[in-house]
Amino acid sequence: MSAEDFAIYASYQINAGGLFVGTLKVIRKTDGRMLFPFQGAPVLGPYPSRQEARDAAATHGELIVKSDIANPES
C-alpha cells in the first residue's frame, strides 16, 4: 500500500468566533473506508488564517496516511 491509495481532502471553515478551523476527510481508496473524520475526532484549530487551517488539515491527513500504511486499520 502507498500514499496513492488514499484520498486526502483538506479545507477549512470559519467558526462562530471568526477564526478558521481545518476540515479533513481521508479515504482509503482500496476499500473505500473513511479514516477521518471519525466519532470523537479532534477539531483542527482554530487558526488565525485560512491557509494555516488548510495546511494543518493537510499535515494531519498525511500523518493519518503514514500511520495507516505502517499499521493498517481494518
Task: Place the predicted regions along the sequence by residue.
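A short, exposed loop/beta-hairpin motif centered on an aromatic-Gly-Thr core
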Residues: 37-52
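Hydrophobic alpha-helical segments with strong N-terminal bias
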Residues: 7, 12, 29, 33-35, ...
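A short, structured beta-strand/loop element
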Residues: 16-41
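A short, charged, amphipathic alpha-helix used as a generic interaction element across diverse proteins
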Residues: 48-65
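Short N-terminal "domain-start" leader segments
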Residues: 1-25
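Intrinsically disordered, low-complexity regions
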Residues: 1-4, 31, 35, 60, ...
